């Protein structure tokens, strides 16, 4: 399969703003893709070489090295390439322009004076993989040579998207939900097959692998997909409510209440002596927790198991729970040993998805919890999360206050009914979180995605200091604007914002974004921030839930304030419009009750 086909479709996708048209065009591309490389077509469309959970590096080629490779491949001086980059602002466009005007290649090609070797998808993928995996002495020069060789063979459009892929800026506006829609069209005959594909993806978070299974064996093959040790399951997500009575009613009048720890949610896989730890974003973070690996080996009786829990930083003197930020020291590669000593952790396990050949995701929570307690040998480090069975509102309220006093964020109330399965990748009312924020009228913070930014004035003049934030609707694969946030940033965080936005800047709005506001720059949806504010309110400027509460207005946050970056969350895990609507309706209900009481 020629890489040119992908480049041509990417060029067409970039010009489209309708999700329906995006899905139709991607469907067409997948129909034309050879089944032996369809997994690679999916990965490239996702902007990656392999799933995040693979223990493999990213490409790791900076702008300067790409410019050097482009210079080698075109015989054009680096200074001239840098000049063109300042003019065009997109190295992919620079590559396209230079390849078109590079007469030494194009004249011969068009006159047929030389045989033109066409790039294949396999060749491009293998070359980029080689670049990513190269390390050690001489790897820098090898990467430049490999990329230069690839660009030399590429035509202008291919070069544009090879550079953009490496740069992390494909700009085709395709999310995982759209890919699943297209796969359903190609291999399942339409939307009826979509739930099957999504369930397979939730249990095996590798769309490339799923596409290959579909291409080789058809839709029936994915019906039998089960959890597999070493391949992460997409995490189940909780809804949020603020009224304990409503929460208990939602879960059927009784449930389990778990502490909500302020730590790193972790999915832990064990197979014999091998242990893998994955983040909620499904990234392999085993390297950060070698101590946890040993704890799990010594605490879990099962041979093959997939568990879920929270890794929490602990004060080494008092044993008290420390804030999540203390775990950031674990991300540094060079001093893990020191971080283990200074920032010890506890592991609080709260769910079981797979155990010695048996899929537990379809079992109700009481069965999962019973088996979890059976296979865990609890000690000072590895424990089953603090929890309580409740069937009265006052029990929930008392346990909530106990959780807060013990240094947690609050509680999660979980259904224990027959339908209380582990809903991988889904957000629903089987789990409901109840959190307390002491600094705001909003009952809870929200996690929103940056989709645009505005330049500041006065002291912040010339800097992008106000961020356009959006909620994510997974059913529509669409981001809806909620607020502009400009407060809460330290000077250091504001400098970090400049770097982040320069790397994510787009020439035009991402097709998945619905906005009636025109920011100074559009941003690729990739960064999630935790935001708090005074209250959820109506706004004619924002698109979140527009037409739901009011025909003229959407929902927004009054006096929004930045709290922290949520690096542990993907954009698809951001707060949904439905959650914001629930928060708005709960606030209205409370106001009515307050008025009635007076």
From Swiss-Prot:
Active site positions, chain numbering: 260
Top EC category: ligase
Cofactor: Mg(2+)
Keyword ATP-binding found: yes
Single GO BP term: cell division
E.C. numbers: 6.5.1.1
Alphabetical list of SUPFAM superfamilies matching this protein: ATP-dependent DNA ligase DNA-binding domain, DNA ligase/mRNA capping enzyme, catalytic domain, Nucleic acid-binding proteins
ATP-binding in keyword set: yes
GO function term, MF aspect, one: ATP binding
Residues binding ATP: 258, 265, 280, 310, 350, 427, 433
Catalytic activity: ATP + (deoxyribonucleotide)n-3'-hydroxyl + 5'-phospho-(deoxyribonucleotide)m = (deoxyribonucleotide)n+m + AMP + diphosphate
Superkingdom: Archaea
Protein's name according to its UniProt entry: DNA ligase
Organism: Sulfolobus acidocaldarius (strain ATCC 33909 / DSM 639 / JCM 8929 / NBRC 15157 / NCIMB 11770)
Gene: lig
């Amino acid at each position: 399969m020629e890489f040119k086909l992908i480049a041509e479709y990417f060029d067409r996708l970039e010009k489209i703003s309708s999700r329906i048209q995006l899905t139709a065009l991607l469907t067409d591309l997948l129909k034309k893709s050879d089944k032996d490389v369809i997994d690679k077509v999916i990965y490239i469309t996702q902007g990656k070489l392999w799933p995040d959970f693979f223990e493999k590096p990213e490409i790791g080629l900076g702008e300067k090295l790409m410019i050097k490779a482009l210079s080698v491949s075109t015989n054009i001086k680096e200074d001239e390439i840098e000049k063109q980059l300042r003019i065009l602002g997109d190295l992919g466009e620079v590559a396209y322009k230079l390849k078109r005007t590079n007469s030494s290649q194009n004249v011969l090609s068009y006159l047929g004076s030389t045989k033109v070797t066409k790039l294949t998808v396999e060749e491009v993928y293998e070359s980029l993989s080689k670049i990513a995996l190269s390390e050690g002495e001489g790897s820098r020069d090898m990467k430049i040579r490999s990329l230069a060789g690839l660009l030399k063979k590429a035509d202008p459009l291919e070069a544009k998207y090879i550079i953009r892929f490496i740069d992390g800026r494909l700009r085709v506006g395709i999310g995982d939900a759209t890919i699943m829609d297209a796969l359903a069209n190609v291999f399942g005959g339409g939307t009826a097959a979509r739930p099957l594909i999504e369930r397979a993806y939730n249990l095996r978070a590798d769309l490339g692998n799923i596409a290959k299974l579909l291409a080789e064996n058809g839709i029936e093959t994915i019906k039998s997909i089960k959890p597999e040790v070493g391949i992460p399951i997409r995490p189940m997500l909780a809804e949020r409510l603020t009224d304990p009575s409503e929460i208990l009613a939602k879960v059927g009048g009784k449930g389990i209440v778990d502490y909500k720890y302020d730590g790193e949610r972790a999915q832990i896989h064990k197979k014999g002596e091998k242990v893998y730890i994955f983040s909620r974003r499904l990234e392999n973070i085993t390297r950060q927790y070698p101590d946890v690996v040993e704890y799990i080996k010594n605490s879990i009786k099962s041979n093959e198991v997939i568990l879920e829990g929270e890794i929490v930083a602990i004060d080494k003197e008092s044993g008290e729970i420390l804030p999540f930020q203390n775990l950031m020291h674990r991300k540094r590669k060079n001093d893990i040993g020191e971080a283990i000593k200074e920032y010890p952790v506890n592991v609080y396990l709260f769910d079981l998805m797979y155990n010695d050949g048996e899929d537990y995701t379809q079992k109700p929570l009481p069965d999962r919890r019973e088996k979890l307690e059976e296979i865990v040998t609890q000690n000072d480090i590895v424990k089953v999360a603090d929890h309580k069975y409740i069937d009265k509102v006052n029990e929930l309220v008392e346990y909530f206050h106990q959780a807060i006093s013990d240094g947690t964020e609050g509680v999660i109330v979980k259904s224990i009914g027959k339908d209380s399965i582990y809903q991988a990748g889904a957000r629903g009312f089987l789990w409901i979180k109840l959190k307390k924020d002491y600094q705001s009228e909003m009952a809870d913070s929200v996690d929103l995605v940056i989709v645009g930014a505005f330049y500041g004035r006065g002291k912040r003049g010339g800097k992008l200091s106000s961020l356009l934030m959006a909620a994510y609707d997974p059913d529509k694969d669409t981001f809806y604007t909620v607020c502009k946030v400009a407060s809460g940033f330290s000077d250091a965080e504001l400098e970090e914002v400049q770097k982040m936005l320069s790397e994510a800047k787009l020439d035009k709005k991402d097709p998945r974004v619905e906005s009636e506001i025109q920011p100074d720059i559009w941003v690729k949806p990739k960064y999630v921030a935790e935001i708090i504010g005074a209250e959820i309110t109506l706004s004619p400027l924002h698109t979140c839930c527009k037409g739901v509460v009011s025909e003229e207005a959407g929902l927004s946050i009054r006096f929004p304030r930045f709290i922290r970056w949520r690096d542990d969350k993907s954009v698809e895990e951001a707060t949904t419009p439905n959650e914001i609507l629930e928060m708005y309706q709960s606030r209205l209900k409370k106001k009515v009750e307050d008025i009635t009481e007076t």
